[in-house]
């Protein structure tokens, strides 16, 4: 079988587990995809590392502070010429997707497209959190979902370094398994769950993650 034709590079790891017997965790779909969106944005700005170090990093921190994330900051990575940044929780990531003005830092059409990717992903994710999802809504989600992933990896048009070249967005290699699942399989899961009178948002590890966070915090509290 040619798995490439099915949108897969390799055979399924667990072919014995049918699609109807498992559900992706909606929390980690959001967390890991926002990690990709933020990473693509920050690393593009780090292409001019001197300018990033001199002013851009501070401006981004100020923008984060403007939307209420006053603890956000960049710090030098162990990888030379790179910076890491403060880890954000789910609520904070949703705040960034909704309110951070990407176009302040990436000008022109590219900045608008990048901001669209953030806002549209937020809209699609919030759809998954709705109580009542209709068949029509799932169909609309599926079309918008596929359009979103295609815009993410929109190719460069025109000859390299030519005046008419239109720079694309990100590489297909930047697409992660979570993004593949989001774009290619979530509508299928929505239909399966709807037929069973279940909701996608109920399949979330958010409560477990919160409990784990509290346990870790308590351990660290008594460590010092």
What are these regions (language model features)?
Residues 1-224:
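A structural signal for the principal folded core domain
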């Amino acid at each position: 079988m040619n798995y490439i034709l099915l949108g897969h590079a390799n055979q399924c790891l667990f072919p014995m587990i049918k699609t109807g017997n498992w559900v992706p965790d909606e929390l980690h779909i959001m967390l890991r995809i926002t990690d990709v969106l933020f990473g693509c944005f920050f690393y593009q700005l780090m292409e001019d590392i001197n300018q990033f170090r001199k002013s851009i990093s501070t401006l981004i921190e100020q923008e984060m502070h403007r939307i209420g994330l006053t603890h956000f900051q960049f710090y030098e990575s162990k990888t030379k010429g790179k910076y890491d940044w403060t880890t954000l929780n789910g609520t904070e990531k949703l705040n960034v997707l909704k309110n951070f003005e990407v176009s302040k830092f990436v000008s022109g059409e590219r900045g608008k497209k990048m901001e669209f990717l953030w806002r549209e992903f937020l809209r699609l994710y919030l759809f998954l959190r709705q109580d009542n999802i209709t068949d029509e809504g799932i169909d609309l989600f599926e079309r918008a979902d596929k359009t979103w992933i295609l815009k993410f990896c929109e190719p460069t048009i025109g000859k390299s370094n030519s005046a008419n070249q239109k720079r694309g967005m990100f590489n297909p290699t930047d697409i992660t398994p979570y993004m593949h699942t989001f774009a290619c399989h979530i509508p299928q899961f929505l239909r399966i769950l709807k037929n069973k009178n279940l909701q996608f948002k109920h399949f979330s590890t958010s409560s477990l993650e919160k409990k784990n966070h509290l346990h870790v915090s308590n351990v660290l509290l008594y460590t010092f």
